[in-house]
């Protein structure tokens, strides 16, 4: 993996995307210093469509809430994440359409999705619009439309990565994506195609390098006694864990727990002496999932040994689906991805089929949390890509991983909470505690302790209001902090 190329692209892409997204804002009368009338029907001589007017109003509302720079940064990284995910999926043949979004089959910057536009089968695709844009030779506009439709179609199988593109995110999608020197063209040219194959870790490296300049800025400001704000904690604290450290930690925690109760499967999990020597010499097979960093336990005192023997009796009763592993600060999912590999070896040694193992790992074993929404997106994506790597039909199974961004309660709508609780004293008490404990949760992250509640009652109430007709219903259903 050419990390210099990855860094060069990611650092440049952040600056470029923020500039391009901001330029789209100017087009709609929105700059850092001035915002034209939010209810305007036209801006700069351009008449707005009903959708554009709605999207522009949503953008202005978000800027008023978070600030101009924060919103432009968020939109830029949202598109960066999507471009990276689409590139990974097209190179590995994971797109359900089997049509490349950025290149042709020879990896030339000639998007196959344009040449195959009239043959595409994507949810939400308006074929009349496709023909209209093709006939008018509006190739750039056609490409942007197809890109948005493709992202929205992927929402069905990857909702944690490809949220429905609506409002201002779509409005600020940069122009001239097909030109020489665009973010997409540079991604194709600078990062070798082979670097995208199978190793989902590339997404983590892209993410770390994308944030590197911001991280430098945060620490430079800190030296001038500028406090690190809650919004900048992710940039200041995230570090992509090197592969050997990830392997060492996972093999000697999750791996050790399993082996202490099931020592008879060592031969299936450990490398041979020849394989270990080759690995140490740098001759490494990318598909090698043997445990090269596992350390045998040191000899213990007889009393300690006896206590360990009792503990191992309990471990011996464990089945793979009973294992629960969490990365409470998951970042972009590097540790979760290797946990997946280790769990696959455990399941295989226990006699599971690949399909059964993959489904059980996602449903029963892996959990991840992060304070950073975009990192949680990438960790979610990493787990889903691991599942797809092992089971080519995984996307059709409707299974979703337990990987979440920590949600804080600072802006919870009081009226929505009142509607949700519906006068129920127990629900009201539970929600009061949750809201109090998750205030500023993104500042504290996984060190927070959430008081156990009657979660079943809360989930039952969510199910109950799903079909309600009430102005507060949608807001109440978005109280995703209940998932914590």
Specify the residue positions occupied by each region the protein language model found:
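Non-catalytic, mostly N-terminal accessory regions of nucleic-acid modification and defense proteins
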Residues: 1-265, 384-408
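SAM-dependent methyltransferase catalytic region
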Residues: 224-231, 235-482
């Amino acid at each position: 993996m050419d990390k210099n190329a990855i860094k060069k692209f990611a650092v440049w892409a952040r600056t470029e995307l923020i500039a391009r997204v901001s330029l789209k804002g100017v087009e709609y009368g929105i700059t850092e210093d001035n915002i034209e009338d939010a209810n305007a029907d036209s801006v700069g001589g351009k008449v707005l469509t009903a959708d554009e007017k709605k999207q522009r109003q949503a953008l202005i509302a978000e800027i008023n809430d978070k600030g101009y720079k924060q919103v432009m940064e968020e939109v830029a990284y949202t598109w960066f994440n999507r471009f990276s995910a689409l590139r990974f999926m097209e190179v590995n043949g994971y797109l359900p359409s089997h049509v490349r979004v950025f290149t042709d089959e020879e990896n030339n910057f000639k998007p196959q999705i344009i040449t195959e536009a009239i043959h595409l089968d994507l949810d939400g695709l308006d074929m009349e619009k496709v023909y209209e844009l093709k006939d008018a030779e509006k190739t750039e506009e056609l490409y942007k439309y197809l890109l948005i439709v493709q992202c929205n179609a992927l929402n069905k199988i990857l909702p944690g990565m490809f949220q429905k593109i609506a409002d201002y995110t779509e409005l600020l999608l940069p122009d001239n994506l097909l030109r020489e020197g665009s973010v997409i063209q540079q991604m194709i040219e600078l990062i070798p195609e082979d670097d995208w194959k199978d190793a989902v870790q590339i997404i983590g490296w892209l993410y770390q390098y994308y944030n590197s300049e911001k991280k430098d800025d945060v620490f430079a400001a800190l030296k001038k006694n500028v406090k690190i704000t809650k919004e900048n904690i992710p940039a200041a604290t995230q570090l992509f864990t090197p592969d050997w450290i990830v392997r060492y930690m996972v093999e000697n925690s999750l791996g050790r727990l399993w082996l202490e109760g099931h020592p008879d499967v060592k031969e299936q999990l450990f490398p041979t002496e020849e394989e270990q020597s080759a690995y140490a010499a740098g001759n490494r097979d990318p598909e090698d999932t043997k445990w090269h960093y596992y350390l045998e336990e040191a000899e213990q005192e007889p009393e300690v040994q006896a206590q360990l023997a009792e503990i191992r009796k309990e471990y011996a009763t464990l089945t793979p689906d009973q294992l629960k592993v969490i990365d409470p600060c998951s970042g972009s999912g590097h540790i979760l991805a290797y946990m997946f590999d280790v769990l696959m070896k455990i399941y295989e040694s226990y006699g599971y089929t690949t399909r059964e193992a993959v489904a059980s790992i996602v449903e029963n074993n892996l959990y991840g949390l992060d304070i950073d929404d975009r990192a949680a997106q990438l960790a979610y994506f990493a787990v889903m890509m691991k599942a797809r790597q092992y089971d080519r039909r995984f996307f059709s199974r409707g299974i979703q991983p337990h990987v979440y961004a920590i949600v804080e309660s600072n802006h919870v709508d009081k009226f929505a909470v009142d509607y949700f609780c519906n006068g129920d004293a127990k629900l009201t008490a539970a929600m009061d505690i949750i809201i109090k404990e998750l205030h500023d949760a993104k500042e504290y992250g996984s060190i927070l302790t959430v008081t156990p509640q009657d979660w079943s009652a809360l989930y039952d109430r969510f199910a109950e209001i799903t079909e309600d007709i009430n102005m507060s219903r949608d807001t109440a259903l978005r109280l995703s902090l209940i998932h914590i």
